[in-house]
Amino acid sequence: MKIINIGSERALEVIKAPQISEKATFLAEKVRQIIFYVSRDANKAEIKSAIEQIWKSQNIKVKSVQIINVKGKKKRFGRYIGQKSDWKKAFVSLKDDREIDFTDVRLFEDK
């Protein structure tokens, strides 16, 4: 995976939110993988760079990133059928058995 530098604004666009579910909690405890909702146009290198930049104060390093494109479900509204938007999620493995503190986000360092 190539190393790229992205700005802090793009980092916040790439990483939308962590996924909180039973499966995500199980993976975080057993396999040390964290699941994030990410932007649909993001690639693995951007996701890795964004996570390392957002949680730079915790010295987080990413070991690997796997991406899944999820199709939106069809929903029915009375007699009309609509479809939810497609989305993308990333499974991120961290180096050195670190854990991310989601409340500690520092993008701009004080000088």
UniProtKB/Swiss-Prot annotation:
Lineage: superkingdom: Bacteria
KW Transit peptide (keyword) present: no
Keyword Ribonucleoprotein (UniProt): yes
Record's keyword terms, sorted: Ribonucleoprotein, Ribosomal protein, RNA-binding, rRNA-binding
Family matches, as Pfam families: Ribosomal_L23
Record GO cellular component, one term: ribosome
GO molecular function: rRNA binding; structural constituent of ribosome
GO biological process: translation
Similarity-based family: Belongs to the universal ribosomal protein uL23 family.
Protein's job: One of the early assembly proteins it binds 23S rRNA. One of the proteins that surrounds the polypeptide exit tunnel on the outside of the ribosome. Forms the main docking site for trigger factor binding to the ribosome.
NCBIfam families: PRK05738.1-3, PRK05738.2-4
Quaternary organization: Part of the 50S ribosomal subunit. Contacts protein L29, and trigger factor when it is bound to the ribosome.
Protein name per Swiss-Prot or TrEMBL: Large ribosomal subunit protein uL23
Organism: Nitrosomonas eutropha (strain DSM 101675 / C91 / Nm57)
Gene field: rplW
